[in-house]
UniProtKB/Swiss-Prot annotation:
Keyword Ribonucleoprotein: yes
GO molecular function list: small ribosomal subunit rRNA binding; structural constituent of ribosome
InterPro entries: Ribosomal_bS20, Ribosomal_bS20_sf
Taxonomic source organism: Rhodospirillum centenum (strain ATCC 51521 / SW)
Gene Ontology terms: biological process: translation
The protein's name: Small ribosomal subunit protein bS20
Gene: rpsT
Any Gene Ontology CC annotation: small ribosomal subunit
Key word RNA-binding present: yes
Similarity remark: Belongs to the bacterial ribosomal protein bS20 family.
Keywords: Ribonucleoprotein, Ribosomal protein, RNA-binding, rRNA-binding
Function: Binds directly to 16S ribosomal RNA.
Amino acid sequence: MANHKSAEKRIRQIKKRTEINRARISRIRTFVKKVELAIASGDKAAANEAFREAQPELMRGATKGVLHRNTVSRKLSRLNQRIKALGA
């Protein structure tokens, strides 16, 4: 329990920020799932389109500090690799 006004304010800010970050992560997961579903269906065109939509969301997550930039790069790289394998 906070004993100072500033500590109470920090608690309010943390709650607000947590909600924003949770929504952002959920949104990113949704976009990644769409790409994975398109890959699983074997539709390269749909997978490419979903990947194109997911890419800025993932990068935004890195910019906002929700995900580490290396994590985002790794996810994008692996998704792209799987999409390219569809055509081969």
